[in-house]
Amino acid sequence: MKPTRKKHVYLVDFACYKPHNPACMCTKEHFLKLIKSTGKFRDESLDFLRKILERSGIGEKTYLPECIMKTPSNTCLAEARNETESVVIGAIDELMLKTKVKKEEIGIIVTNCSLFNSIPSLSSMIVNHYKLSHNVLTYNLSGMGCSAGLISVDLARQLLQVHPNSYALVISTENINSGSYFGNNRSMLVSNCLFRVGGAAILLSNRISDSLRSKYYLKHIVRTHKGSQDNCYNSILQKEDDNGDTGVALSKDIMSSAGEALNANISTLAKNVLPLIEQLKFLTNLVARNLFKKKVIKAYAPNFMLAFEHFCIHTGGKAVQDQMQKVLKLSDWHMEPSRMTLYRYGNTSSSSVWYELAYCEAKGRVKKGHRIWQIAFGSGFKCNSAVWYALQTIDPVKEKNPWTDEIHEFPVNVTNH
């Protein structure tokens, strides 16, 4: 038997959620007032939160859910469900308008949300809301962290290999309500500062007819999981503190865990995307470091700017961005989509790489033939990469995305934010 030829997976279009209610927009000062008004945080915790916010890279127009913006805040299950439904349905509605795809044509749904796992699932919520066909294939990923968006894309890709002539709808979001922490453990307070409302809906297709209208096609997916190492596994952990308050704890090993996962991921990716001369340099260095003491021979950092025109690096925080820029030797221009997304929208978890791609499109930077690298990392510890090839030049005048009405205001100087 002849091996089955792999089907191209096309990215028809995508949409990122932007809250329409101005009451959900939250400045850093107002965020601190909301936190203080709960009466659950000690003065030293409030001081710590202020310091984190000041150097977080987050701006003054990020979004929080309505239930948290209220005084007193209400973090019940019903409000968590309302938050997620608003984000998910809002993103899908916009995507449907952009693509003109009929709901009856959707054959696969993959959703991911780490902290909110309702019954019925988010994928079932979508089926119910849009009254989709009884034979739609649905998958709901939970607890997989900020890199789960690209895991969802990979799952959809694999399903599209065995289900011909199909559309796959991928939804990536996070629930801020469920992730809120009301205790005083410093390792668990950081998440309160960084994470904000956001979500993305992505339409993938294996239909040959969609090759003419799709924006991109998927060239590579590389997934790395370091969960076998205890320090990596425990670096991001949802748990209860000594007083029984639940939150997500970030350990002191988080940066080293991210570094290990990143190194493993880019080592695999490099073989698929780098020019031959760069591959030879990288391989020679790797062999030399294995033969001799690694401290003697410095690791060679491949020039990924030879492989990609655009970089969409997960908005894990300013410190993470600084380290990624240093490791990958990227210019400020290449880091701009990630830094501006963190500044304007905060850390929207698994959907952040889509806000970054939307930024590139709104700036008119994406041309036919360009290569885009999305890279995200999160709990597990996992690092995942997706490589996209632009099938057309994106005209920003014709685009409608969260940046459209304000793209002229960016970039801004985030040095002091």
What are the functions of these language-model segments?
Residues H8-Y10, E105, N165-Y167, R371:
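Residues that mark the start of a beta-strand
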Residues Y355-I375, C383-W403:
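Catalytic phosphate/nucleotide-handling subdomain of diverse soluble enzymes
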Residues M1, S56, K61-Y63, C67, ...:
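Conserved catalytic cysteine-centered active-site region
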Residues P3-K33, F41-R50, E54-S56, E60-C67, ...:
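Hydrophobic pocket-lining "lid/loop/helix" segments that shape and contact the acyl-thioester
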Residues V12, N112, S142, L169-E174, ...:
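Short beta-strand segments
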Residues G107-S114, N140, F311-C312:
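Short glycine-rich or small-residue beta-strand-to-loop segments that form or flank ligand, phosphate
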Residues A23-C24, P120-S124, I151-D154, G179-N185, ...:
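Short acidic, glycine/serine/threonine-rich loops at helix termini
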Residues K102-G107, N135-L137, A307, W333-H334, ...:
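Short acidic capping loops at alpha-helix termini that bridge into adjacent secondary structure
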